[in-house]
Amino acid sequence: MEQQFDYFTVTSLLVFLTFLLRLVWGWKKSSDKIKIRLPPGPSKLPIIGSLHHLIGLDVDLPYYALTDLANKYGPLMHLQLGKMSLVVASSAKMFKELMKENDLAISQRPVPYVARVLEDAGRDIAFVPYGDYWRQIRKISRMELFSVKKVQSLHYIREDQSSKLVESIRGHAGTVMNLSKAVSDYTSTVVARAAFGSGCKDQDKFIRLSLEMVAAAGAVSTLPDMFPALGFIPILSGKKAFLKSIQTEADKILDVIIDEHIQKTKSNEYDGKESDKEDIVDVLLRLEKSGELEIPITTQDIKAVIWSVFAGGTDTSSTTTLWTMSELMRNPKVMEKVQAEIREKLKGKKEIYESDIQDLHYMRAVIKEALRLRIPGPLLLPRETMEPIEVDGYVIPERTKILFNAWAVTRDPQLWENPESFIPERFIENPLDYKGTNYEFTPFGSGRRICPGMNFGIANVELPLAKLLYFFNWQLPPGMQPHELDMTAKFGVVCGRKNDLFLIPTPYNNIP
């Protein structure tokens, strides 16, 4: 009887303790919820959240709509978009608090639905989850793939392809030509040669597929990110299948490229030692062969890196070059000034090399101003909180998406005089740079998730732009005035011109 009593006593005690622990846990969770204090934002409706407030705003260019809402609700704003809890930062002060003070806590990057469709989601440079593999791929990117030394070592590719670009434009002298296509072809080929060399017989096909991939990804609905139950929409529309078919076809080409590189190392054509002319596949295979990596690199990892390079390096550089040329055509005095600098510094040269353009300070100011006024990624890439964070007196819970409206910051009249005007002089003798420490100017992001290919991207702009402005004078199509040039943007993975840029090149005659 005593044993039975002890049994029930112990059992009752365990039940009571379990109940007590649950009560305490429930109180703790409730207490945590009470502590949450989200930033202000528009009112919410059941199911759709704040989506109805975007109706009537410019949803084709969402950074416009978000800027309008931020003007009403403040520089740190909360939106509930279906299931997605989103905080939008729209000031340099909020950028600094998030990207500097809370950088570690928001080092996670949410993987969008369109990336999850692809097999390499979570292994590429852009969307790899925060953790050991992210640390490894970031170190490889900074120290091997996109270091200043590595980018400089690829000068021969940019010099070769930019010379071909000049010759191509000479063939259109005096006629209206599609400069958008010419610049896109240049950038795509430079990225391809940097990624896997110049001996790929299917290079042009892969470039075409990569451009189709970016366009197809931009066309996939974002609704499944806000309403996961609507994931069937891209399936029924055929867009998911189309995206997968492009990836499958391109992957076959990458399989051949990687295998050829492996065979090259086995046949001693490449000795496995670091070389100035290593392409990205060479570098990754060398690192894998060295045995020094904590996490082995697979073929899928190499493919994911190549896709990242194409997605991040091709459109961003060509878009920046084309927006720069567009602004120069709209501002003839700036065009005259930058051409005068280039032609004075490079006077008498029949060919231009990267070593020749290091002192073109005004041209670099022109590029910076184009990046400010026509930022390629106006909303940057989103982050996600890994734990509750406090920002400006508000408490933002774990797993909240963080969006950075860089477009609003670079147009902020409190930070920039005449922010809507193209004035490169604002960057002359000004330490303001795009490398992530000036939060009013972050075209490549900041902190742990800053774009690792920044140096590579800028290098792919500077040399071709210098050659375009040195070797040619440029005119708008007949009958068009500078203020009539269409500057409409198209939102996507990169925010470029909606319509191609057509100009008339005339060879500059004062070159011996």
Curated annotation (Swiss-Prot):
Accumulates in mature fruits and in juice vesicles. Gene3D superfamilies: Cytochrome P450 (1.10.630.10). InterPro entries: Cyt_P450, Cyt_P450_CS, Cyt_P450_E_grp-I, Cyt_P450_sf. It is a single-pass membrane protein. Keywords: Heme, Iron, Membrane, Metal-binding, Monooxygenase, Oxidoreductase, Transmembrane, Transmembrane helix. CDD domains: CYP71-like. Pathway: Secondary metabolite biosynthesis; terpenoid biosynthesis. The keyword Transmembrane applies. It catalyses: tirucalla-7,24-dien-3beta-ol + 2 reduced [NADPH--hemoprotein reductase] + 2 O2 = dihydroniloticin + 2 oxidized [NADPH--hemoprotein reductase] + 2 H2O + 2 H(+). Its EC number is 1.14.14.-. Its cofactor is heme. One of its GO terms (molecular function) is iron ion binding. One of its GO terms (cellular component) is membrane. Heme binds at C451. The chain crosses the membrane at residues 7-27. It is found in: Membrane. It comes from the Eukaryota. This is Dihydroniloticin synthase CYP71CD1. It comes from Citrus sinensis.
